[in-house]
């Protein structure tokens, strides 16, 4: 009987632990949205434009990023030239080749990955359960001197090089303010396959009632990241459709005429 009671007690504790873990994850996410303006206000965000800059060898390089629910582009201004990266018009994904300075289209696997990422806009934790994602509290961890909740977000698998691979991001939420200050993702293809990419976020400021990070850095885990300073953020902007269009070559223009 004693062993039976112990077994029952162990099972009860296990159930409570699972329940508390799930509740804690939900509480962290709820507090995150509450502290950054409210989930309802986040749901009203249909588009976002960010102006930022990075420093390369002492030279400040302006960057303009526009993201909508189905389109996006990044424009980098270098020595009077605008170079576009990660441009998506809803169907075609393209970027400017830095060597040839010509626009090149991406394959359909990359197109689908971008479509899935845009479906998460403006935040992957917003309605994450309805999107089929799961969130799990992995414990606590100290990040740059701050205590954080380590939350693993598992999204729908993505297809890379013809194979279905896991799609997992790990977020580190500050335990005091409940905002993410770091995020990790594993590189699933290319020369950096297997590496852990690290993004850090800080200097949260108010933008039309919502709080967003104005200082970021991105790079490989355990290596110095590239700092990104955001100078302005606009919400629900009306973007020029021509900014997303894949540029036609002179030959294509002549053929169309």
Segments from the language model and where they lie:
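Short, solvent-exposed loop/turn elements at beta->coil junctions and helix N-caps
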Residues: 53, 138-142, 186, 204
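Short, surface-exposed beta-strand-loop junctions and turns on beta-sheet-rich folds
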Residues: 80-82, 101-103, 187-189, 220
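Gly/Pro-enriched, hydrophobic low-complexity segments
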Residues: 147-244
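N-terminal mature ectodomain segment of secretory-pathway/periplasmic proteins
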Residues: 27-101, 139
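Bacterial Sec-dependent N-terminal signal peptides
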Residues: 1-25
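Short capping micro-motif at the N-terminus of alpha-helices
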Residues: 63, 85, 104-105, 150, ...
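Flexible, processing/modification-adjacent segments and terminal tails
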Residues: 23-30, 34, 92-163, 190-192, ...
């Amino acid at each position: 009987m004693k062993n039976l009671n112990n077994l029952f007690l162990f099972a009860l504790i296990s159930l409570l632990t699972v329940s508390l873990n799930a509740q804690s994850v939900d509480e962290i996410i709820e507090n995150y949205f509450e502290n950054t303006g409210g989930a309802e206000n986040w749901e009203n965000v249909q588009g976002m434009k960010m102006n930022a800059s990075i420093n390369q060898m002492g030279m400040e390089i302006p960057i303009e990023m526009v993201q909508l629910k189905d389109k996006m582009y990044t424009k980098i201004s270098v020595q009077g030239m605008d170079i576009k990266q990660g441009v998506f018009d809803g169907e075609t994904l393209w970027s400017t080749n830095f060597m040839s300075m010509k626009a090149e289209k991406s394959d359909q696997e990359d197109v689908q990955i971008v479509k899935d990422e845009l479906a998460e806009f403006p935040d992957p934790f917003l309605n994450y359960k309805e999107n089929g994602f799961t969130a799990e509290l992995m414990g606590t961890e100290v990040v740059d001197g701050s205590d954080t909740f380590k939350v693993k977000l598992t999204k729908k698998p993505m297809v890379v090089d013809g194979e279905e691979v896991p799609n997992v991001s790990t977020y580190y939420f500050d335990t005091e303010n409940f905002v993410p200050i770091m995020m990790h993702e594993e590189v699933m293809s290319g020369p950096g396959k297997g590496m852990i990419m690290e993004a850090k976020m800080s200097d949260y400021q108010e933008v039309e009632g919502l709080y967003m990070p104005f200082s970021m850095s991105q790079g490989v885990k355990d290596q110095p990241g590239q700092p990104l300073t955001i100078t302005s953020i606009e919400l629900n902007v009306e973007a020029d459709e021509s900014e997303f269009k894949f540029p036609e070559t002179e030959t294509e223009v002549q053929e169309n005429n």
